[in-house]
Amino acid sequence: MIASEVVHDGMIWDVVRDTVDLGEAGVVRREYVRHPGAVSVIALDDDDRVLLLRQYRHPAGAELWEPPAGLLDVPGEPLQGAAARELAEEADLVAGAWWVLADYLSTPGGSDEALRVFLARDLTQVPVADRHVRDGEERDIVVRWVPLEEAVEAVLAGRLRNPSTVVGVLAAAACKARGWRGLRSVDAPGDRVAGPGDGGGA
């Protein structure tokens, strides 16, 4: 890295311009979105139905079906803690069992956003008196429980397009086909650059 500057200071994320020496490839400039990261939750009930929320997403100009999800915007909060918070706030649910389903980079050519997708099971309702009051885009959230196989078909047909939905649903289906073997613990390390043969997160 030769130089780095913030060219746009946003409410949630910034746009950064880096000057990087790539050796024989030369010196290049790259602008990208610097993102705090996020988590999402594939919550499955005892009948292997996945919880999806319909929520308006302004950049897409549409309401999208997606799992509970949110930014890593609480300093020092563990990833699983952030996921549990989002599950409670957006879906009024608490999970008794957690695993890591997948790690992915949403747009590695234009953003450093890294996301972790959790699997949550053994679900119970948050008591009414303790429920989060939703407002803004979350105020009119619609909740639907969808059989996992039906969700897979919707992904493959292009009806489910949110990236965490696509990654999470397909990962859950793959894990189910393997008898749920190989799920990672909630404190498994996540590495933004490890490859398939490196034993780290993808």
Range-by-range predicted roles:
Residues 17-19, 43, 119-121, 145-147:
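Short, well-ordered beta-strand micro-motif
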Residues 94-101:
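A short coil-to-beta-strand element that immediately follows conserved catalytic motifs
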Residues 3-42, 46-47:
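Acidic, metal-coordinating catalytic segment for phosphate/diphosphate chemistry
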Residues 35, 40-85, 127, 134-137, ...:
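Conserved Nudix-box catalytic region and its N-terminal flanking loop in Nudix hydrolases
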Residues 19-24, 107-128:
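Active-site-adjacent beta-strand/loop module that shapes the phosphate/pyrophosphate-binding cleft
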Residues 63, 100, 108-111, 135-202:
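Nudix hydrolase/Nudix homology domain
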Residues 3-7, 102-107:
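Short, solvent-exposed loop/turn elements at beta->coil junctions and helix N-caps
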Residues 14-18, 63, 114-116, 142:
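Short beta-strand micro-motifs in enzyme catalytic cores
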